[in-house]
């Protein structure tokens, strides 16, 4: 269970549900017209029903993300699985040396009837061509060099690994064919983390639709998940309250196309 600290009380983040469980289950918060459908959506019931099952069966560790309490739990081997993005590798290598060699990587589990892995996320950069912009061409050169120069990319990755710092796989499929991107990792017991990162992007689910109201919606949904985790309501009640409060506080969302 991912949470953030708030004055000593954990606050549940809906972010991982939005990027992981919900897309994998084909869930929807809004329909194609921006109307709230989370209360009647079968995908939502699948996604949050899975969360409910894991919680009811005592399979979730309730702690704070990216803080010492979680790393201590990992090093004490109280955590067996993370459903999380590849970025988490950096924090594991940096803070959980005691578990080196114990971990393995796999694609996100698929929901029956949906058969899609987790939804991939991307990073975008943009150049605003407005007036005199003397560095736009330099930026383009740097970006292409960083993205497609295999030797330079490999040198950078080695440096980042030595620092236990984050790095990303190239977007070039040609570069990914290099043996470098299939090298085994001691931290993962000889499995190639780099290769698995690429494989785990295969058969990805579609991301949820994007709206300008998403930040507010996340707060509403997260509040109901918090009440559920606190034992104040069932998951069915939580979903019903999400639906009711989204309709009352936001109403119709603007769909970004």
Predicted segments, located by residue:
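Bilobed periplasmic-binding protein-like "clamshell/Venus-flytrap" ligand-binding domains
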Residues: 1-11, 148-161, 248-257
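Extracytoplasmic/periplasmic solute-binding protein
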Residues: 1-36, 43, 79
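Glycine-centered hinge/linker elements that transmit conformational signals in sensory
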Residues: 33-64
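Short helix-initiation/N-cap motifs at beta->coil->alpha
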Residues: 62-76
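Beta->alpha turn/N-cap motifs
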Residues: 67, 84-90, 121-123
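Alpha-to-beta junction loops
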Residues: 76-85
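C-terminal lobe and pocket-closing loops
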Residues: 92-99, 113-121, 125-219
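A structural supersecondary motif
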Residues: 101-112
């Amino acid at each position: 269970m991912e949470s953030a600290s708030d004055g000593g009380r954990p606050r549940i983040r809906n972010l991982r549900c939005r990027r992981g469980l919900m897309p994998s289950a084909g869930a929807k918060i809004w329909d194609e017209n921006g109307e709230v459908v989370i209360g009647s959506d079968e995908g939502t019931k699948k996604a949050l029903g899975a969360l409910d099952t894991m919680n009811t069966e005592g399979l979730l560790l309730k702690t704070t993300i990216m803080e010492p309490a979680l790393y201590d739990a990992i090093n004490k081997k109280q955590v067996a699985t993370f459903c999380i993005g590849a970025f988490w590798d950096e924090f594991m290598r940096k803070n959980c040396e005691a578990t080196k060699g114990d971990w393995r990587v796999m694609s996100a589990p698929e929901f029956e009837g949906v058969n899609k892995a987790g939804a991939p996320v991307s990073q975008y950069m943009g150049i605003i061509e407005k007036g005199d912009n003397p560095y736009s061409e330099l930026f383009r050169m740097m970006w292409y060099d960083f993205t497609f120069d295999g030797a330079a990319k490999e040198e950078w990755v080695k440096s980042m690994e030595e620092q236990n710092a984050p790095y990303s796989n190239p977007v070039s499929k040609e570069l990914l064919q290099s043996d470098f991107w299939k090298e085994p990792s001691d931290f993962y017991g000889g499995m190639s983390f780099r290769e698995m990162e690429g494989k785990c992007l295969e058969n990805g689910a579609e991301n949820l639709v994007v709206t300008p109201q998403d930040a507010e919606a996340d707060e509403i949904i997260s509040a109901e998940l918090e009440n559920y985790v606190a034992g104040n309501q069932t998951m069915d009640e939580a979903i019903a309250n999400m639906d009711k409060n989204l309709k009352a506080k936001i109403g119709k969302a603007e769909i970004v196309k």
